[in-house]
Amino acid sequence: EEKIAYLVEMRSSGRNRVQDYAEKFGVEFFPGEKPWGVKADVVMPSAMQNDVHMEQAKQIAANGVKYYIEVANMPTTNEALSYLMSQPGVIVAPSKAVNAGGVATSALEMAQNSERLVWTEEEVDQRLRQIMNNIYTMSVEAAEKYGLGYNLVAGANIAGFQRVADAMMAQGIF
């Protein structure tokens, strides 16, 4: 809890320096290096688009990653993403699904504003959880329907396309 509290304090104060955290808690810090060489069960690239290339993807996989969660918008090149998805035991959560939470929260805020409502934090969280669970379920079901197993990237692409196509057809746009 102390470490999380310190991270929250750093974030809110604008002192987002990893070095400060490393010094306070006595952990290794590698200035100027990217984290892809560190052994980890969970990897969450969250900086910028196309930051993870094939070389880094191979390094990440070799280090035993189990969950690769794209927090940034498309942080992984297509080649690297395909490689990670092909690795046994690696689950890839695609950025379009992961980042939907931020978009959904904005939509919930707009809904509150347009109806002049005020929801509690718990109500917003419950609605957001439902939306994110639906996205996950739709992604899994789409991947399974098209024989793609547990490929969340393909499932999210298919489910997203299907929703847009259905909306266009409902509007008479072909």
Kindly label every feature range from the protein language model.
Residues 23, 28-31, 45, 117, ...:
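Preference for short coil/turn "hinge" residues that link or interrupt alpha-helices
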Residues 48-50, 74:
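Short glycine-rich anion-binding loops that position phosphate/pyrophosphate groups of nucleotides
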Residues 8-14, 34, 42, 56, ...:
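Solvent-exposed, flexible loop/coil residues
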Residues 44-46, 71:
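Short, well-ordered coil/turn residues at beta-beta hairpins
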Residues 61-174:
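Adenosine-phosphate binding glycine-rich loop
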Residues 1-39:
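Glycine-rich phosphate/diphosphate-binding loop of Rossmann-like nucleotide-binding domains
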Residues 29-40, 50-67:
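Rossmann-fold NAD(P) dinucleotide-binding segment
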Residues 18, 56, 80-81:
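Residues within well-ordered alpha-helices
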